[in-house]
Amino acid sequence: AVLYNSPNFGSRTSLSNGKNAAFAVVLLLSLLIYGSRCLSQRNHLCACGNNHSSH
């Protein structure tokens, strides 16, 4: 049972680590896109800051 469970457990942990890494990459990309979009609109930078403070 131990020999059967250990490779299965290893594959599951690596799979969950891959999912976590992919989620982190997507989160960072969305933050970068949001930040660049906010900075590209210089006249709306104040409104963007107000949204952050209210949130």
From Swiss-Prot:
UniProt keyword annotation of Transmembrane helix present: yes
Residue stretches spanning the membrane: 20-39
Main location (coarse class): host cell
Membrane disposition: Multi-pass membrane protein
One of the GO BP terms on file: transport of virus in host, cell to cell
InterPro entries: Plant_vir_prot (IPR001896)
Compartments in which it is found: Host membrane
A family per Pfam: Plant_vir_prot
The keyword Zinc is assigned to this record: no
Source species, domain of life: Viruses
GO cellular component: host cell membrane; membrane
Key words of the record: Host membrane, Membrane, Transmembrane, Transmembrane helix, Transport, Viral movement protein
Function, in words: The three proteins TGB1, TGB2 and TGB3 are required for virus movement.
Family: Belongs to the carlavirus/potexvirus TGB2 protein family.
Name of the protein this chain belongs to: TGB2 protein
